[in-house]
């Protein structure tokens, strides 16, 4: 077998016609263990047996603490509109520029192998392999999230995860925790809405959720929100009965639909839009633009088309390109930066940290995560470091090595920051207006479906009357008629 002497990366393209050990020695019998006589005890010297069983016992890696259930596909992103006035990002430099991507869709709460018909947010993560490094855009199929401060992220996930005693998901825990956080209301108006269970991944919207920053070549910084719209339209499963039927027939229906569609040449496609806000104008709005529980009104901040995403190739190996695929919002490129969005700031650390736990400190060396452009730093050694290096200098600065600091394509605009060190909530929480507006935008049938789903969940026998009353009051603050409808369905009285 011919091996690459510099990269040391084994590949199935180098497969031999006979079985070997991991070290390359031929295996003459892969059917029987080495024993003393045909019935005798197994000998410890059967190295191949020990290696085979030991490797099998270690095939699984820790699953993601969230978004464990998912499916990936590969393709390209093509810039279709001139956005150079907004950002100096190289892959958006001109219409027609194509960038390779890999995309992972997922559910959030439950384990690998769980049904893909659960009422649960869906992840929509895109890795762009640009000429200036990888950019990861992580989002969901809802434009908002349950909380606005990352310090509560472990708590909200614990509340949605199965009960630690029974390992059964129970919504009384969700309602108990989030009754203390009315900011969560807006996301419930998506979760219990018709979009709560997408029919599959191809007919699903995506949203960046958090607020990012575009930086232009002139040094102008503007807030930006990202939106993915499927060109084939949005489809959802409207009833829990249909979801149970689809999920009962095939727990992997969305994964199979994605794979089969691409294999048949019916390539899923999305259009990327952005909303852009000048930070100098943020005070004119009745919400905080850095609050991820809020949407930006499209009549005031219209969607602007940027490009199209096409998935035209299935993964070659599910483990290598799905389980080992690692995303993190900390991966940005020149022209795209973070904002002071509290959830985003926390995610920048948390995602990289969870990948180091799942995959090891050198997870960005894995082929699916590695950049496609030349790169160089002094991050040496560590577990499973398989990068060939022959430099003598592993520090900076040095007169004996060519490594230099990169000159920024455009400096980040200076932004004075002043204030006291404090733990505090934002000034404009405004938690009830947008949920109420969303509810009133629906037709009567859609409102009724929302009421039924929400009330049925509140009707769980372990949800106390006190807790139901709290939620009825919260919903009534969004819309008085909604509070009345929920109360009526639960045979309770709304406190208006």
Swiss-Prot record:
Q: In which tissues is it expressed?
A: Leaf mesophyll cells, pericarp, seedling roots and the coleoptile.
Please verify whether the record's keywords include Metal-binding: yes
Indicate where this protein is primarily found: mitochondrion
Catalytic activity reads: 2 H2O2 = O2 + 2 H2O
| Region of interest called Disordered, as start-end residue ranges on this chain | 1-25, 402-422
Enzyme Commission number, as recorded = 1.11.1.6
Q: Does the keyword Transit peptide apply?
A: no
Similarity comment: family membership: Belongs to the catalase family.
Q: What does this protein do?
A: Occurs in almost all aerobically respiring organisms and serves to protect cells from the toxic effects of hydrogen peroxide. Its levels are highest in the light period and are lowest in the dark period, hence it may be important for scavenging hydrogen peroxide at night, rather than during the day.
Subunit organization:
Homotetramer.
Which protein, by its recorded name, is this?
A: Catalase isozyme 3
Organism encoding this protein: Zea mays
The record lists the lineage as: Eukaryota, Viridiplantae, Streptophyta, Embryophyta, Tracheophyta
């Amino acid at each position: 077998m011919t091996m690459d002497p510099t990269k040391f990366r084994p590949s199935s393209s180098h497969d031999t016609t006979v079985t070997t050990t991991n070290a390359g020695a031929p295996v003459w019998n892969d059917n029987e263990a080495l024993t003393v006589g045909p019935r005798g005890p197994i000998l410890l010297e059967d190295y191949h047996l020990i290696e085979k069983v030991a490797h099998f016992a270690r095939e699984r890696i820790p699953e993601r603490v969230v978004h464990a259930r998912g499916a990936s596909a590969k393709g390209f992103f093509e810039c279709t509109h001139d956005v150079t006035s907004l950002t100096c990002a190289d892959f958006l430099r001109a219409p027609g520029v194509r960038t390779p991507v890999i995309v992972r869709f997922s559910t959030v709460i439950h384990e690998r192998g769980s049904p893909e018909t659960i009422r649960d947010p869906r992840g929509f993560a895109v890795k762009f392999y640009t000429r200036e490094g990888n950019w990861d855009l992580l989002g969901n199929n809802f434009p908002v999230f349950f909380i606005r401060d990352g310090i509560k992220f472990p708590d909200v996930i614990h509340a949605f995860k199965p009960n630690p005693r029974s390992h059964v998901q129970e919504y009384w825990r969700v309602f108990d925790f989030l009754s203390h956080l009315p900011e969560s209301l807006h996301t419930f108006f998506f979760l219990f809405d018709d979009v709560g269970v997408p029919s599959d991944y191809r007919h699903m919207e995506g949203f960046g959720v958090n607020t990012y920053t575009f930086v232009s070549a002139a040094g102008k910084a503007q807030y930006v929100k990202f939106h993915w719209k499927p060109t084939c339209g949005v489809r959802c499963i409207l009833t829990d009965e249909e979801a149970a039927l689809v999920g009962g027939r095939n727990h992997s229906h969305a994964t199979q639909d994605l794979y089969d569609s691409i294999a048949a040449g019916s390539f899923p496609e999305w259009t990327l839009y952005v909303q852009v806000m000048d930070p100098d104008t943020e005070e004119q709005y009745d919400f905080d633009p850095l609050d991820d529980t809020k949407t930006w009104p499209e009549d005031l901040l219209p969607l602007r088309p940027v490009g199209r995403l096409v998935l035209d190739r299935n993964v070659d190996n599910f483990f290598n390109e799905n389980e080992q695929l690692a995303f993190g919002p900390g991966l940005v490129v020149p022209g795209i930066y973070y904002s002071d969005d509290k959830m985003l700031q926390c995610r920048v650390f948390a995602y990289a940290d969870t990948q180091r736990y799942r995959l090891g400190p050198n997870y960005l060396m894995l082929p699916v995560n590695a950049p496609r452009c030349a790169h160089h730093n002094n991050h040496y050694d560590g577990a499973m470091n398989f990068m060939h290096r022959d430099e003598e200098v592993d520090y900076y600065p040095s007169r004996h090595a060519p490594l230099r600091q990169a000159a920024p394509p455009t400096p980040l605009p200076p932004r004075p920051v002043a204030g006291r060190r404090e733990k505090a909530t934002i000034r404009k929480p405004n938690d009830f207006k947008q949920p109420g507006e969303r509810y009133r935008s629906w037709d009567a049938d859609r409102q009724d479906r929302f009421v039924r789903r929400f009330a049925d969940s509140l009707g769980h026998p372990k949800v106390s009357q006190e807790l139901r009353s709290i939620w009825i009051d919260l919903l009534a603050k969004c819309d008085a008629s909604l509070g009345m409808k929920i109360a009526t369905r639960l045979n309770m009285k709304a406190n208006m």
